[in-house]
Amino acid sequence: MIVRTLEQARQSDRRVKADNWESVRMLLKDDNMGFSFHITTLYANKETPIHYQNHLESVYCISGEGEVETVADGEVHAIKPGTLYVLDKHDKHLLRAFSEMTVACVFNPPLNGKETHDENGVYPLEAETIME
């Protein structure tokens, strides 16, 4: 059984920071669950271009407000607490946080832990592994 708290993970290498967000990676590839689970905070008034070419992701909004825009068709969807969006087609998208947003994210295949977006908004398929 795996038991860890958000605070424990936040105080460890499982907390990864970037310019527009920070993510606490609660479950990772080495946990052998077949997916990774993250609690991510998106900073207010920021836009993040993302294109997960190697991963599928589901995102559930816990707090805050923003929107997600699919680049291919310009369709915009509001995000508020209780909203789930799923990137099931490796959708290139723009994620905008109007206020600080906290979201729960599930990735398949799972992340190793140290991933941040490259210049194209992509996470690498294999990145540095967090060692505990």
UniProtKB/Swiss-Prot annotation:
Its EC number is 4.2.1.108. It is an enzyme of class 4 (lyase). Pfam families: Ectoine_synth (PF06339). InterPro entries: Ectoine_synth, RmlC-like_jellyroll, RmlC_Cupin_sf. CDD domains: cupin_EctC. The keyword Methyltransferase does not apply. It comes from the Bacteria. Keywords: Lyase. The keyword Secreted does not apply. HAMAP family: Ectoine_synth. Belongs to the ectoine synthase family. This is L-ectoine synthase. It comes from Hahella chejuensis (strain KCTC 2396). The gene is ectC.
